[in-house]
């Protein structure tokens, strides 16, 4: 009888210990999650949620406007030497609005930089704030991105450099259709569309043209883009599907 009671007490103690361990693990995970996101907000800036139900059409391409400024070489595009994608993508958006500025010049004015030409996401909003332009960093779904494009402005996004890598890259989206996303990218080795919209290596098909020259130099298959756009990782779990909205 006493032996049975002792066994019962032992089981209760073990059960309580297991429960305590589970509680401590859950508490640690929640605390780590909260602290991680507080640090992310401080370092990278807050994100505004922005979601859309659907886009207006199956495809849309931003076109150069009357005030769009080309680079000194006569092209819409310029390429970075090393880092600086935050400045080059920001310069592309400004040139679309009629402001003559190059990527290197812009990057010098991007705040919150690290070594190697890398900038925190809040550097984009800080750059435009210096120019009196309200730019909000957002996180949402692809429909929200489509709806922003349909306002006729290129949209800066944050994507992975490669699907299986954690390196982040700023690029400018200028269009989409049912199969691909179209970008103005400042890394020359990723360019896969020529000035007439014809696909070049490593692309396998032909992109549609838009006037005398296209307003994009890179296409990414839609499903691959969504994987690249998902930048969530252990150190930044909530920072995914990031794009910038100009007011």
Residue positions per predicted region:
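Helix N-cap and loop-to-helix transition residues
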Residues: 102-103, 120, 141, 177, ...
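Active-site-adjacent substructure of cysteine-protease-like catalytic cores
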Residues: 134-192
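Active-site-adjacent structural segments surrounding the nucleophilic cysteine of cysteine proteases
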Residues: 9-115, 161-164, 177, 246
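Structured segments of extracytoplasmic/periplasmic soluble domains
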Residues: 91-100, 113, 127-134, 148-152
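Stable alpha-helical elements in mature extracytoplasmic
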Residues: 81, 86-90, 120-127, 141-145, ...
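Noncatalytic regulatory segments and standalone regulatory/sensor domains
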Residues: 21-23, 114, 150, 154, ...
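N-terminal targeting leaders characterized by basic, low-complexity, disordered sequences
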Residues: 1-8
């Amino acid at each position: 009888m006493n032996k049975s009671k002792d066994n019962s007490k032992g089981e209760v103690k073990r059960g309580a210990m297991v429960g305590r361990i589970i509680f401590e693990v859950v508490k640690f995970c929640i605390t780590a999650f909260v602290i991680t996101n507080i640090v992310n907000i401080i370092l990278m800036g807050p994100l505004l949620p922005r979601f859309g139900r659907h886009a207006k059409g199956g495809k849309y391409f931003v076109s150069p406007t009357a005030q769009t400024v080309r680079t000194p070489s006569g092209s819409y595009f310029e390429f970075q030497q090393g880092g600086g994608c935050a400045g080059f993508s920001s310069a592309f958006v400004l040139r679309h609005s009629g402001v003559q500025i190059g990527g290197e010049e812009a990057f010098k004015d991007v705040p919150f930089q690290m070594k190697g030409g890398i900038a925190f996401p809040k550097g984009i909003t800080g750059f435009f704030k210096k120019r009196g332009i309200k730019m909000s960093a957002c996180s949402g779904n692809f429909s929200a991105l489509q709806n922003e494009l349909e306002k006729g402005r290129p949209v800066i996004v944050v994507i992975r450099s490669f699907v299986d890598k954690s390196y982040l890259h700023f690029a400018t989206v200028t269009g989409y259709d049912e199969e691909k996303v179209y970008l103005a990218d400042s890394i020359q080795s990723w360019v896969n569309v020529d000035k007439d919209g014809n696909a070049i290596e490593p692309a396998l098909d032909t992109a549609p043209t838009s006037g005398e020259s296209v307003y994009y130099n890179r296409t990414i298959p839609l499903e691959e883009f969504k994987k690249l756009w998902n930048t969530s990782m252990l150190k930044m779990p909530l920072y995914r599907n990031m794009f910038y909205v100009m007011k």
